[in-house]
Curated annotation (Swiss-Prot):
InterPro entries in alphabetical order: E3A/B/C-like, HECT_dom, Hect_E3_ubiquitin_ligase, Znf_UBP
GO cellular component, as recorded: cell division site; cell tip; cytoplasm; mitotic spindle pole body; nucleus
Catalytic activity: S-ubiquitinyl-[E2 ubiquitin-conjugating enzyme]-L-cysteine + [acceptor protein]-L-lysine = [E2 ubiquitin-conjugating enzyme]-L-cysteine + N(6)-ubiquitinyl-[acceptor protein]-L-lysine
Name of protein: Probable E3 ubiquitin-protein ligase mug30
Enzyme Commission identifier(s): 2.3.2.26
Annotated compartments: Cytoplasm, Cytoskeleton, Microtubule organizing center, Spindle pole body
Active site positions, chain numbering: 775 (glycyl thioester intermediate)
Transmembrane segments: none
Keywords: Cytoplasm, Cytoskeleton, Meiosis, Transferase, Ubl conjugation pathway
GO biological process: meiotic cell cycle; protein polyubiquitination
Domain HECT: 453-807
Length: 807
């Protein structure tokens, strides 16, 4: 093998001294200056190449750019190429056969300069030494017996070392060569629709046998794998040549918690992910197909791989933060970027197979970074890693935080603009989006003001109910949006209709009138205002709606929750094994409801004359679904989308997936966990000092707090009665309670643990009704004398109160 040359790392700025290939000296100062200018010019050229020439998907490129002179004044030509592990842009002498990256210390072999036939010859030569499975298994058995004898008879360290020597040599040979690894664990039939071409049963067996023998053998396995990955020797002529990465990824030591193994296994994993992430696009597609086959098509197996890489990202974030003490420390970390790209491959496979929930890809440690700084870097297209490039890694809470921060920034900008406009024009310019409505004319007043083109809907929302004394600090706008959307999105209003009698979902009305287009535009603005102001709506829309909102392509499966009976019928048509033409008697037309009766529509030109048969039934189904979900509602959705983007236009909304945008708009669908809500609730009492004095002195932090947590008030009768009463309420009454206290009947999209309720006991027994401050999720009650009295007062408050007043 050629000895590697130490190479300057152009992208990171790290440099190792490269000895002059030809001696040179400068005869004059002008010659030195000219050479210096030349070096600066080339350096700028390299930086431009680095910034503009990289693949935006971070896929490996084998670009081969020659430079006339290096930056050391030598006339030797240099070549620029990315490292196969960390993707740093490197330069090396054109005649070199290998070079070492100064960042990740990986030796890169320059095989891409060989022809295809030369590469195949070299690959077959390197893998010519065949190791049979039987020989490997027999060596393991012999070593196990030899180790037992050595430990029983002598216990001598040298004897134990000698007993394991044959197996250690075999491990070094097998796990030090990609071709041998691929040959050893390949199945006879190779890749197929069901199999990735590897014998995973054999892989598990050999790993188990090797790692349960002796620590010296385990260490040799780790050493051989790390040595291989420090010089991968890639041949790049067939994606299947990289299957050895899947074999190495099955090493159980990667999940080890032993202190002696963790550092080595982490080093191995980062190199596996590094090489895998920097392969070319064709090979990435090959790995995605492997991730859809056995054993990856087992949800538990797939989940373990996702958890392994997520754990690696989390640990890396903690390690680098502890060294840098900066919240944007990870942006140039190649290990995190490599792990994220590998996760993208797994995510792509999961999107097609739906093996595990998409929330399984969330990296919880990413919630603790400076999310808005990450978002700004992504928006500015700075050439560095950002989590926003891989939004499936960000949790729902992280995305909501980014959206809220972005909305707050826009609101502040609008308020500042209003302030300066007031000064310059000497006129009062409203810094808020003010909506003033009469409760008995809610729909009429609201739509009139939303239709006002002079209003800026990106300002912070403030609502005033005329004739009421409520001051909007959050609660009034929540109730206004809740009441208004229930009317606008109800089937009685006419803009949206029920998809099917058996479905609760709403869809755009096919038989719209031209004058209703403006109403669709206003309903889009209304939904945008809700998201912009972090308010949940009571709107039942199918998955297809949210995918269209994010401009994602629709598929046949999106019809499932939209029109389930139609979906089942079309699926039966696709799976029917008999004669479709004579059995179904269909043609390329469909019947749709109109204002008066039904109307027949051709799915393609001449569709009424074209029968559906076994050959074209798939085309019929796709055209049917496309017409139903896209063509029939094109004008309605276009108006709705324009209104929505008028408020929510921007990059933050694109971070969400369709299931997440549904939660963002509607709130959490989960059943309310009142036990969890009780545990995060805080309290304050009219006799709080008495309670505080009863708390042990060993817990001074709680006595100093303004509010008390549940554990310190749980024995008070009024608290026991209250939670017992709430837990026994019907679902309808529980929703009324949420509306009474918060102004909305839903908990936040991130769940009950992020929803804090505050309960104040205002005084001793009283005949007054409970009071709520919806702006602050605050309930005020009195210490009623009995459970029955508490129930009577609370029921009255929930069922009979309406409107906002100041007491």
């Amino acid at each position: 093998m050629s000895r590697p040359i130490e190479i300057a790392n152009v992208s990171s700025g790290n440099r190792r001294t490269l000895p002059a290939l030809h001696g040179s000296s400068f005869s004059s100062r002008s010659e030195l200056d000219n050479n210096t200018n030349s070096k600066i010019s080339r350096r700028l050229r390299e930086l431009v190449c680095q910034r503009m020439g990289e693949n935006p998907l971070r896929l490996r490129q084998s670009f081969h750019e020659t430079i006339s002179n290096d930056s050391y004044g030598n006339s030797e030509k240099l070549v620029i190429r990315p490292c196969i592990c960390c993707n740093s842009v490197l330069r090396y002498p054109a005649q070199a056969m290998c070079f070492r990256c100064s960042l990740c210390m990986t030796v890169n072999d320059v095989y891409f300069c060989l022809s295809g036939s030369q590469i195949k010859t070299k690959a077959s030569t390197d893998g010519s030494q065949f190791i049979s499975v039987e020989h490997f298994v027999e060596t393991i058995h012999q070593t196990r017996s030899a180790l037992q004898l050595a430990k029983q008879r002598t216990g001598n360290v040298q004897a134990i070392v000698a007993a394991g020597l044959p197996l250690r040599e075999l491990i070094s040979l097998v796990f030090g060569s990609p071709p041998i690894l691929n040959k050893l664990f390949s199945v006879k039939n190779g890749c197929s629709i069901q199999s990735s071409g590897l014998n995973y049963k054999l892989i598990y067996q050999l790993y188990h046998d090797i790692t349960n023998l002796d620590i010296l053998i385990t260490n040799e396995l780790l050493r051989a794998i790390e040595s291989l990955l420090r010089r991968p020797m890639l041949y790049c002529h067939d994606p299947a040549d990289y299957q050895y990465l899947l074999i190495l990824l099955e090493n159980p030591l990667l999940n080890s918690k032993s202190k002696n193994i963790v550092n080595k296994s982490s080093s191995i994993l980062k190199r596996i992910l590094g090489v895998l992430s920097n392969l070319n696009e064709k090979t990435h597609h090959f790995f995605i197909s492997c991730f859809k086959k056995q054993p990856y098509n087992n949800p538990k197996f797939f989940r373990r791989k996702v958890d392994l890489i997520n754990k690696f990202i989390g640990q890396r974030l903690m390690e680098t933060y502890s060294r840098n003490k900066r919240k944007h420390y990870y942006n140039n970390d190649w290990q995190i970027k490599s792990a994220a790209i590998t996760m993208a491959l797994l995510y792509s496979a999961n999107s097609q197979m739906r093996l595990i929930d998409r929330s399984s890809f969330y990296c919880i440690m990413a919630d603790f970074i400076n999310l808005y700084h990450d978002f700004e870097l992504w928006e500015q297209k700075i050439n560095c890693f950002c989590f926003c490039q891989y939004p499936f890694l960000l949790s729902m809470g992280a995305k909501i935080s980014i959206l809220q921060l972005d909305a707050r920034r826009k609101m502040e900008i609008k308020a500042r603009e209003a302030f300066f406009s007031s000064i310059l024009s000497k006129m009062n310019v409203e810094p808020y989006l003010m909506i003033r409505v009469r409760r008995d004319r809610l729909l009429e007043d609201s739509l009139r003001q939303i239709n006002d083109r002079n209003k800026d809907f990106r300002k912070a929302l403030k609502v005033e109910f005329l004739g009421e004394e409520g001051i909007d600090a959050g609660g009034l706008k929540r109730e206004w949006l809740l009441l208004l959307t229930r009317k606008v999105f109800s089937p009685e209003f006419g803009l949206f209709v029920n998809c099917e009698e058996s479905s609760n979902y709403l869809w755009f009305n096919y038989s719209h009138r031209s004058k209703e287009i403006d109403y669709y535009h206003m309903s889009g603005i209304l939904m945008g205002i809700a998201i912009h102001n972090s308010i949940n709506l009571d709107v039942q829309m199918p998955r297809a709606f949210y995918k269209k909102l994010l401009q994602l392509p629709l598929s046949f499966n999106d019809l499932d929750d939209f029109q389930p009976s139609l979906y089942r019928g079309l699926k039966e048509l696709l799976l029917f094994e008999g004669d479709v033409k004579n059995t179904y008697g269909l043609n390329f037309t469909i019947n749709l409801k109109a204002v008066e009766g039904f109307r027949t529509v051709e799915l393609k030109e001449g569709g009424s004359e074209l029968s559906v048969d076994n050959e074209n039934r798939k085309e019929y189904v796709l055209r049917y679904v496309d017409y139903l979900l896209n063509t029939t509602v094109k004008k309605q959705f276009s108006a709705f989308f324009d209104g929505f983007m008028k408020v929510c236009g921007g990059n933050a909304i694109s971070l969400f997936q369709d299931n997440e945008i549904s939660k963002l708009i509607r709130g959490s669908e989960e059943v309310i966990d009142w036990e969890l809500l009780k545990n995060v609730c805080v309290y304050d009492f009219y006799d709080q000092n008495a309670i505080s004095n009863s708390i042990s002195e060993s817990e001074p932090s709680m006595t100093a707090s303004k509010y008390l947590c549940h554990s310190f008030v749980s024995k008070r009768k009024i608290i026991l009665w209250f939670w017992d009463l709430i837990s026994h309420y019907s679902l309808k009454m529980q929703k009324l309670f949420l509306i009474f206290v918060t102004g909305s009947d839903r908990i936040p999209a991130t769940g009950a643990h992020n929803f804090q309720l505050r309960i104040s006991v205002l005084g001793p027994d009283s005949d007054q009704l409970p009071i709520s401050h919806t702006c602050f999720n605050h309930l005020c009650i009195w210490e009623y004398s009995s459970r029955e009295k508490l129930k009577k007062k609370l029921d009255t408050a929930l069922l009979e109160t309406n409107g906002f007043n100041i007491r």
